[in-house]
């Protein structure tokens, strides 16, 4: 076990990193904290690419379809690491409609392989959903197929399911990580931290908000010195909390919230308040789920954020 370390190392210009399917730069942030100099990123979404550029001002960002991008565009000097998480919706266990190889997103791992094969970084980190471990194309397991492809182009490969809450993130989200290197190093995944960051440690310094409230700029409710180490890390470049937006739910929905304790869900709501549900017993366990303040959050999916309830306030998450 080990303690969380939120300190940022000075980037080493010799350790060049590339982030594919970069989003706003979550993997890149971890890489820079470890001393890697993020030089390039590829992200097709305009808004995500703009966020990445703002977060990593020294990086060159290619905002385009990776399938149309030549790896030579990024291959200007020796690269230490390529990282990325190809689109995962098609592999997700929650996807019951297009969870097969006919989903074009399920072939995007081929693009990651193409860039690694062409650029030949010393290391790569491939991240995806747990569901990929159970996914088959015919009789072949896709995870095994991907790992063997990396081995075929000269990499020593190891993989493991990691939980974000074991490494300083206040959310119990699991992901498959496949890590490889060209030096034959028998890589070991890092040990879990000796504690988990709770929901309260993560958000208790944020403004108190009402149902449907929009507060583009507010004030922290806890002084910096009294905030948790995690909150201090989140606030180190911020003087005020911004873009605090709460989904507006109807009054009868807010009334339901009042009956739900921390860790409880729809099952705590009286039947007379659930009249619009044809069969309440068929509700998913995550519907009307109030988070437990003293523990990491359950997995948060943005498309259903209003179904997760603030641990101390009768509203959805902001």
Task: Give the residues covered by each predicted segment.
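Bulky hydrophobic/aromatic "packing anchor" residues in well-ordered structure
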Residues: 162, 203, 300-301
């Amino acid at each position: 076990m080990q303690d969380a370390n939120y300190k940022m190392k000075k980037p080493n210009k010799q350790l060049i990193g590339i982030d594919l399917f970069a989003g706003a730069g979550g993997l890149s942030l971890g890489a820079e904290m470890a001393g890697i100099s993020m030089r390039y990123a590829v992200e097709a979404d305009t808004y995500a690419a703009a966020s990445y550029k703002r977060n990593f001002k020294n990086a060159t960002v290619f905002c385009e379809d990776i399938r149309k991008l030549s790896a030579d565009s990024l291959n200007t000097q020796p690269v230490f690491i390529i990282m990325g998480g190809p689109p995962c919706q098609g592999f997700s266990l929650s996807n019951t409609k297009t969870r097969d190889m006919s989903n074009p997103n399920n072939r995007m791992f081929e693009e990651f392989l193409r860039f690694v094969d062409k650029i030949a970084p010393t290391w790569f980190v491939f991240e995806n959903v747990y569901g990929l471990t159970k996914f088959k194309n015919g009789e072949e397991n896709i995870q095994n197929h991907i790992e063997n492809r990396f081995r075929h182009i000269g990499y020593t490969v190891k993989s493991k399911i990691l939980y974000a809450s074991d490494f300083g993130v206040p959310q119990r989200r699991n992901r498959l990580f496949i890590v490889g290197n060209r030096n034959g190093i028998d890589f070991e995944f890092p040990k879990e931290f000796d504690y988990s960051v709770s929901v309260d440690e993560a958000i208790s310094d944020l403004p108190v908000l009402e149902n449907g409230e929009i507060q583009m700029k507010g004030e922290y409710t806890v002084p910096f010195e009294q905030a948790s180490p995690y909150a201090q890390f989140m606030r180190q470049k911020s003087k005020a909390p911004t873009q605090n937006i709460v989904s507006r739910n109807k009054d009868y929905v807010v009334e339901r919230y009042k009956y739900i304790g921390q860790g409880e869900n729809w099952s705590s709501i009286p039947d007379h308040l659930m009249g619009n549900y044809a069969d309440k017993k068929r509700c998913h366990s995550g519907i009307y789920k109030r988070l437990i303040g003293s523990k990491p959050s359950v997995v948060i999916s943005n498309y259903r954020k209003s179904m997760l309830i603030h641990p101390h306030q009768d509203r959805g998450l902001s």
